[in-house]
Amino acid sequence: MFLLPRFVLVSCIIGSLGFDNPPTNVVSHLNGDWFLFGDSRSDCNHVVTTNPRNYSYMDLNPALCGSGKISAKAGNSIFRSFHFTDFYNYTGEGQQIIFYEGVNFTPYHAFKCITSGSNDIWMQNKGLFYTQVYKNMAVYRSLTFVNVPYVYNGSAQSTALCKSGSLVLNNPAYIAREANFGDYYYKVEADFYLSGCDEYIVPLCIFNGKFLSNTKYYDDSQYYFNKDTGVIYGLNSTETITTGFDFNCHYLVLPSGNYLAISNELLLTVPTKAICLNKRKDFTPVQVVDSRWNNARQSDNMTAVACQPPYCYFRNSTTNYVGVYDINHGDAGFTSILSGLLYDSPCFSQQGVFRYDNVSSVWPLYPYGRCPTAADINTPDVPICVYDPLPIILLGILLGVAVIIIVVLLLYFMVDNGTRLHDA
């Protein structure tokens, strides 16, 4: 009987040490309340339309195609749709949000606004944009696009100043110079309106450098003024460079209201599209899967830069993207990462997704959900353990101390009895 508690304790410890519950490199969900934003690698409609039944084109398991939990468009991305005429209305809602897109705007596309511009600035813009998207989708359920109506009282129209290859910027819109202005040293305004959403992500952009036109250099200056609250948001050019600069964007999170766009120099810019954020939720980190090309094309790491704990978990493959349909579609590593969407998981962390909530040899960093902090094992050969690790250790120490005390007492009484017998 004395040995039974120690046997149970030892069995529990052995069972706990023998149970393997490592974090897995997948994206998953706690329950059915989830949504995925993607591109061709998760665009079921694209596969059905152009490659019937050839689902090797995707990294997504085709069993998820009828789930109604995916908004994806081949050849597009949320960033691309936000800024350019090549538009797809990404729309979705869920408690747990997953992103697997972004590859359709990379250094491979080499976009820059002007011939002497810089694609590096646009990669910086991409990182800043996705930072706002990821942070806000950790606290909002719903994402979609909305048009932003504006009123400009002049006669000039918007102009396609910023374009490269097939990409033409239309958000923000550039209002051309009025015919009666001899240069770009003028102030001009336009009203725009935000309504129908809880909050909005809108661009505020300037050329951060000396912009040359007809032998004159100009410093860009743009402001948005909230006429309801009196709050003003603004950017002024601070760089003195004349080449190698481009369109620097900040991404503001604004409430509904009436706004005034103001330009003090160069061309007026006005937002035409916004990310519509709706339905506040309890904080739930988003999950982002790296979106990159095969190494034959140049990619960037901007989604990784944007995805930081505690609001975001980033998942990536350790090998080059090598597809089975073509080199850029149907990679085994990324298919494995997305396979976690086929089942529920209790715990998410920076290291990965835990399949069980009982015990693990890896302590979860930035945990979310029901994460493994105690043993709870029930196998045919091992009794159920209901101890946290610390009490188990303390109990072992106490048992050891008790054994030592018992041995000391036994020796004491044996010596004492021997002395009494000798005296008798």
From Swiss-Prot:
Virion surface-side segments: 17-392
Span list, region Esterase domain 1: 7-127
Biological processes annotated in GO: fusion of virus membrane with host plasma membrane
PTM comment, free text: N-glycosylated in the host RER.
TM helices/strands, residue ranges: 393-413
Catalytic activity: N-acetyl-9-O-acetylneuraminate + H2O = N-acetylneuraminate + acetate + H(+); N-acetyl-4-O-acetylneuraminate + H2O = N-acetylneuraminate + acetate + H(+)
Compartments it resides in: Virion membrane; Host cell membrane
Keyword Transmembrane helix annotated: yes
Record-level GO cellular component terms: host cell plasma membrane; membrane; viral envelope; virion membrane
Region: Receptor binding, residue numbers: 128-266
Region span, Esterase domain 2: 267-379
Disulphide bonds in the chain: C44-C65, C113-C162, C197-C276, C205-C249, C307-C312, C347-C371
Enzyme Commission no: 3.1.1.53
Record's bilayer topology term: Single-pass type I membrane protein
Catalytic residues of the enzyme: S40, D326, H329
Keywords attached to this entry: Disulfide bond, Glycoprotein, Hemagglutinin, Host cell membrane, Host membrane, Hydrolase, Membrane, Signal, Transmembrane, Transmembrane helix, Viral envelope protein, Virion
Classification via InterPro entries: Capsid_hemagglutn (IPR008980), HEMA (IPR042545), Hemagglutn-estrase_core (IPR007142), Hemagglutn-estrase_hemagglutn (IPR003860)
GO molecular function, one term: sialate O-acetylesterase activity
Glycosylation site residues: N54, N89, N153, N236, N301, N316, N358, N417
Intravirion-side segments: 414-424
Family: Belongs to the influenza type C/coronaviruses hemagglutinin-esterase family.
Quaternary structure and interacting proteins, as annotated: Homodimer; disulfide-linked. Forms a complex with the M protein in the pre-Golgi. Associates then with S-M complex to form a ternary complex S-M-HE.
Its biological purpose: Structural protein that makes short spikes at the surface of the virus. Contains receptor binding and receptor-destroying activities. Mediates de-O-acetylation of N-acetyl-4-O-acetylneuraminic acid, which is probably the receptor determinant recognized by the virus on the surface of erythrocytes and susceptible cells. This receptor-destroying activity is important for virus release as it probably helps preventing self-aggregation and ensures the efficient spread of the progeny virus from cell to cell.
UniProt protein name: Hemagglutinin-esterase
Natural source organism: Bovine coronavirus (strain 98TXSF-110-LUN) (BCoV-LUN)
Source organism phylogeny: Viruses, Riboviria, Orthornavirae, Pisuviricota, Pisoniviricetes
Gene: HE
